[in-house]
């Protein structure tokens, strides 16, 4: 896996239009690969925080090419990790992640909202589980009330999974209670996929009973 990661870093570096931007990218990747919990630009020992800020916000380089390269590499890893023979399972995790923000952000005002009493940027992220690794594949920003719900965004991400994954794997969707809506579950079923999600105890069954009142069987006997 280390050799594959090194190859990916090299391919990403080659996408940079100048040597200066290539060095900035390598400095940013170094912060994450150190895994010290300090990936912010000011912790870089190679480049200044202002240089990395310009690289991320001003310098012209193709985000699409970066995403395309990473996804191609990810698919290669998925297929290399799959077992030969019968159609293997592929776990797809959908998670709602909040990046809490304080203060005012005029340029991102439409992206900052409150969810579960947390103010910030709320991301619906889709991960592919490859061996021991959980690799982010795609994401959408929940924009607050009046916009598509996290469950609706999660369903859109699932629908946009590459067909080659759906054709070669038994895709198993794993998600928490934020994605346990009827629309999400029926949508997954229409796609002929499988899903395991959390369901709030306040949900009602067809017969009117509340989930939390259902008798729990005694397995000790």
Model-found features: residue ranges?
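An internal, acidic/charged active-site-proximal segment
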Residues: 141-221
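Short, conserved catalytic/metal-binding motifs centered on acidic residues
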Residues: 40-44, 48, 88-99, 126, ...
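Gly/serine-rich nucleotide phosphate-binding loop at the start of the catalytic core
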Residues: 1-67, 71
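Active-site-proximal, Lys/Arg-enriched surface segment
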Residues: 57-131
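Short phosphate-engaging motifs
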Residues: 62, 135, 180
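Short, conserved acidic/polar surface loops in the N-terminal third of protein domains
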Residues: 101-108, 137-138, 184-186, 208
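Electropositive, glycine- and tryptophan-enriched low-complexity nucleic-acid-binding patches
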Residues: 54-55, 59, 113-168
């Amino acid at each position: 896996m280390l050799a594959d990661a090194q190859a990916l870093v090299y391919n990403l570096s080659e996408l940079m239009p100048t040597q200066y931007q290539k060095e900035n990218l390598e400095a940013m990747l170094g912060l994450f690969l150190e895994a010290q919990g300090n990936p912010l630009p000011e912790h870089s020992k190679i480049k200044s925080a202002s240089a990395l800020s310009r690289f991320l916000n001003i310098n012209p380089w193709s985000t699409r090419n970066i995403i395309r390269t990473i996804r191609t590499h990810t698919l290669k890893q998925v297929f290399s990790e799959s077992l030969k023979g019968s159609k293997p399972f592929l776990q797809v995790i959908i998670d709602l992640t909040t990046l809490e923000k304080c203060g005012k952000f005029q340029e991102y005002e439409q992206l900052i909202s409150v969810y579960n009493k947390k103010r910030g940027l709320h991301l619906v992220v889709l991960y592919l589980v490859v061996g021991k690794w959980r690799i982010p594949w795609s994401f959408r920003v929940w924009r607050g009330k009046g916009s598509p719900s996290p469950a609706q965004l999660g369903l859109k991400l699932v629908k946009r999974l590459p067909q080659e994954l759906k054709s070669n794997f038994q895709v198993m969707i794993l998600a928490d209670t934020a994605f346990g809506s009827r629309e999400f579950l029926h949508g997954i079923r229409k796609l002929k996929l499988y899903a395991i999600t959390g369901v709030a105890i306040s949900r009602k069954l067809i017969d009117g009973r509340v989930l939390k009142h259902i008798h729990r069987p005694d397995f000790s006997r």
